[in-house]
C-alpha cells in the first residue's frame, strides 16, 4: 500500500465517472439570486463514447492505494470532470468493479441535479449512480426535495424512494408532495408519484394512490395543482385539474370542482388543431343534483371552430347551450358570464374568390332572461356578393344579394322569407391629402310573410303577406387631411381633418313589413357619416341630409398621437327624416341633429382621458355622455369614469314595453377603479359604482392578494345590485336587492401551473362583477 500526503493527483482514466461533456446554460429564476456557474443547468451535447473517455481530476489531502484493487482518497476530497463535481470526506475507487463510493458530507452536481448526501455510489461502466439520505435540487427544471434513496438509471432519468418534491425555493416548505416512490424524467419533463400525499406546512391534505405531473413548461400529461377557496355563496370549494396531452395537435383539461353547498361539477376543455381544416375547442360542464337548485342536474357545453381551407373556404361554428337561465348567475363558467342575456348558436361557411363570395349561415339563440324577447332563428341565410372594377380604380360595380328564412315559435309574430338584391356603383377618388367617394345603390327587397295563425290581430291587419320594396340610395363623402407644425407648442404636429357627406334616400312606407333583424345604430361622431341608421334592411330610413364634422390630432416629435378631438352634426333638409320614438320631443324641432363630440388625450403615457358627448339642441340638454380618466403609475393605476344616458334617448333609440322596470330616469352612473402592487408579493384592487339617479350602490368589489414563489392566497368581497323589490325601481317602500359574496382563494404555483402571476389588473379582469374594467382609449400609438 502506498501513502501520499496533500497531493494534487491528475489521472486520465479510460472510463469516466459521470455523464457526457456538457455545455453550460443559464437557468435563472427572477425570484432567487443567480446561482454560481457550477449550479446552473448544463445541456448535454456529446455522446456516450466521449463521456467514457473524459479525464477526471481528483484532489485530496491523503491517498491510500492498493494496486489493482482500490484507491482511497480522504480529507477534503474533490472530484471533477469538466463542470461536474463531487466533494466528500472520503472517496473510494474500486478498480476491479469500476465503482466509486463517496461518503461523509457528500455534495454532488452533474449539471442536472445538485445534492447533499451521506453516500454516493457511481458505477463507471454503466454511467449510473445512487445517492442515500439526500437533499436534492433539479437544475434544468423546477423541483427540489429529499429522498432516502436516489438512483439515476439513465440519462436524465431519476428514481426516488421515500422522497418529497416541491417547487418552492430553498428554505420554504409551504407545500410539498411526499411519496413512497417518485420517477423523474427530465427529458420528458414529467414526474410519476406512487402513493403521494399533498402536505401544506407539513400537514397532510389529501392522498391519491398514483399520479403524474409536469415539471417543466412543455405540454405534459398529468395533474395540475389544486386550488382551494371559500365563498359565502357556495361554501368550501376544491378544484383539481388534470391535463391530458393527447397528441401534438390535441389536448384536454379535465377539472373536478367540489362545491360544499352544491356538489361536484366536472368540466372538460378539449382543444384541437387540424392540418388544413382549422382549429377549435369543445367545452362541457356537468353538475349532478345541485343542492341549491331543487337537486336538478345542471350542464352546459360549447363548440367552437374556425378554419380556412385552401385559402378560399371559411368555416365557423359557435354553438353554446346551458341547462337553465340561472346557470351563469349561480355557477362560474368558461362558457359565458353572468351578464350574458343570450347564447349564440351559429354555423357559417363561406367561399371566397377574386371577384365574388358566397356564404351560408344558420343562427339561433338561447335566451337567458325570464322575460323573453327571443330573436328570430335564421334557418338559413344565403349571401352572394359580386365585385368588379369597371374603369381602373375610379369606378367599381358590386352586387350584394341575400336570401333569409326567419323562423319563430312565438305565435304573436310571423315567420318570413326575405330576398334582397342590392346593386351599386362606387367612384372612389383619392390623393395624398384628400378622399372623395360617391356611390349610388338600389335596394330591392321581397318579403313573403306567413300571417297564418298570427294571434296578434292588430299586427296581422297591419302586415301584408307579400311585399316588394325598391329604394334608391345616393351618397357622396369627402374628407381632407391638412397638417402643420404647431407654433404654440414646440415639437408637435397638428392635423385638421374636415369631412362632409350628403345622403339621399327617398321616403317609403314600410309599416307593412315586420322587423326581423334590424336595430337602430348608435349615432356617435363616427356614426354621423354612415349611410344607414339601422343595422339591418327591414327598415330603410329615409334621408335628405348633410353631415359635417372635423377631427384635429396632435402628434409629438416621435409621431405619437397625444390629443384627438372630433365634433360633428347632421343637417336635415327634411325634418320628417329625423327619427324619434320619444313623446318628449317638442313639436317645433330644428333641422339639426344632436352635436356629437369625441375626445382622447394621452399625457406622457401615464395620464389618459376619453370623453364623448351628444348634445340635443331641440331639448337644449345633454342626451348621452361618457367620460374616463385614468392615471397610471409604477405598480398600479386609478381610474374614474362616468356614463350618462337620458330616458328620452333610450326611448328614442330602443322600443321597450316595460322601460320602467329597467330605469325611471335614464342612466347616471359614476365609478372608480384602482389596483396597486405593493411589492412582488402583495397586491390589491377594487372598484365601486354608484347610481346617481336612484342614489344607491350598484356594485363594488375589493380584493387583497398575496403571492409567493410557490403559492398564493386572495381575499375578495363583492356586492352587486340584482334588482328591486317587485321590479319597482326607486319607488317608495321598494328597496334594492343585493348579492353579497366573500371568498378566499388559495392555490399552488410551480410545475407549469402558475395560474396567476397575479397582476392587480388581471384580478379585475377576472372578477365576476357585471361592470368589467376597461380602457376606452383610442389614440393611435
Swiss-Prot record:
Transmembrane segments: none annotated. The keyword Transit peptide does not apply. GO terms for cellular component: cell outer membrane; transporter complex. Its main location: membrane. Gene3D superfamilies: Lipopolysaccharide (LPS) transport protein A like domain. Keywords: Cell outer membrane, Membrane, Signal. Together with LptE, is involved in the assembly of lipopolysaccharide (LPS) at the surface of the outer membrane. Component of the lipopolysaccharide transport and assembly complex. Interacts with LptE and LptA. Belongs to the LptD family. This is LPS-assembly protein LptD. The lineage of its organism: Bacteria, Pseudomonadati, Pseudomonadota, Gammaproteobacteria, Vibrionales. The gene is lptD.
